[in-house]
């Protein structure tokens, strides 16, 4: 006789919709929320691979190891990548992001880690979001380590793709993640030929 490892019934579409509404409330977002079946690296990579492509130029803010990983994914997508690297013991400033955008007006995608778990630094997303919004680039935020520990307002901050995970400050299980997706982001994802 065999027994299922987990004898829980599968979640229905209604259950997922209810969870997505609760996550939207947590993020104070009116955007769509998608819950992938996987840990946060899955939607992080998916957002980058959907938002970047050959012919696009990305500003990749590197304040720790996750920013380095994002740069590798962006290059793998064929995007031209401008790395804005700051010392791992410091946060990036909106002024630095603005200078990078001004120096490279072709930038159409920005990736940023809100809070680097490996370094303990938190980047000023509200101020950076203003600069990115004024430039017009799509803005992706890794909020895996910050959700539940820091204020997180993707709509107010102009974040188009906001990825969260349950396993860090929220104390939840690994393998649970979500992403809020703006209308601009959906258009960009739909337009990606890959």
Residue ranges and their predicted role:
Residues 2, 9-11, 30, 42-194:
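Conserved PLP-enzyme active-site core in the AAT-like
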Residues 1-37, 41:
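A glycine-/small-polar-enriched, mobile loop at the entrance of the PLP active site in fold-type I
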């Amino acid at each position: 006789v065999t027994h299922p490892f987990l004898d829980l019934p599968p979640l229905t579409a209604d259950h997922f919709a209810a969870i997505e509404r609760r996550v939207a409330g947590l993020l104070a977002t009116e955007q769509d929320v998608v819950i992938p079946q996987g840990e946060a690296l899955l939607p992080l990579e998916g957002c980058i691979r959907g938002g970047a492509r050959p012919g696009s130029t990305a500003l990749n803010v590197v304040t720790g190891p996750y920013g380095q990983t994002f740069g590798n994914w962006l290059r793998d997508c064929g995007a031209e990548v401008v790395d804005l690297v700051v010392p791992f013991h410091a946060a990036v400033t909106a002024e630095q992001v603005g200078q990078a955008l001004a120096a490279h007006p072709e930038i159409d995608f920005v990736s940023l880690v809100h809070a680097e778990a490996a370094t303990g630094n938190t980047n000023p997303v509200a101020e950076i979001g203003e600069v990115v919004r004024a430039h017009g680039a799509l803005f992706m935020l890794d909020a895996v380590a910050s959700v539940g520990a820091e204020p997180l307002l993707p709509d107010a901050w102009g974040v188009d793709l906001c990825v969260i995970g349950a396993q860090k400050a929220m104390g939840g299980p690994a393998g649970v993640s979500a992403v809020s997706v703006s209308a601009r982001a959906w258009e960009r994802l739909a337009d990606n030929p890959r």
